[in-house]
Amino acid sequence: MKISSKYEKELRKLFELSKKTYIINFQLRNEELISNFSDVTDEEKINIIKEGIKIACQKKNSTEIENLMLSISFFRLYDRSEFIEDYIKLSKKEFHEEHETIASYFQRFHLPQTIDCIYELAISNFEKYQWDDNFALVRKCCFALGDINTPKAKEKLELLLQSEEETIREHAMEQLKRCDFTNKDIE
């Protein structure tokens, strides 16, 4: 896929500066990335990142997806609805490591239209999560379903109660006890 010439320079700069991310007080920081894009509008940042996601998916480049997700976070764009379809597509791709981040972003949205996707992510059998006996991804998905708080979300949590894994059942039950599931199932 050809990068649109409009965003080619910005994407290269974004990827280069993303490599300079560091940790202070257990928080990821990248002041240089933020300052280099300070004159770029949020809409332009969204368009640049969306273009980058398309290209990274085509190349199956996990590092680029990670850098793009970091950029979304640094620019505080994670709750922008323009990314919902990208998050849905990325949640189904195994080549990257950002599934837990995506589950957390879904949790922020509280959108009934993401329920099926969140459930599919919770039951996905991606190889990289098969070692995780704490089921961190599943727990984040359960929280996202709980925060959506609709009858359909409750149904998906009840399906997770049927898991052979006790920890998954516990995560689902935690949300079933926490929520009242009275929000409307409007997609």
Walk through the language-model features, giving the residues of each:
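Short inter-helical turns and helix N-cap capping residues of alpha-solenoid HEAT/ARM repeat scaffolds
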Residues: 61, 94-95, 126, 134, ...
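Structural detector for internal amphipathic alpha-helices that build alpha-solenoid repeat scaffolds
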Residues: 28-43, 55, 62-79, 89, ...
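Amphipathic alpha-helical scaffolding segments comprising HEAT/armadillo-like alpha-solenoid repeats
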Residues: 2-12, 42-56, 78-93, 111-127, ...
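Long alpha-helical scaffold regions
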Residues: 17-18
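Charged, low-complexity interaction regions
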Residues: 22-24, 60
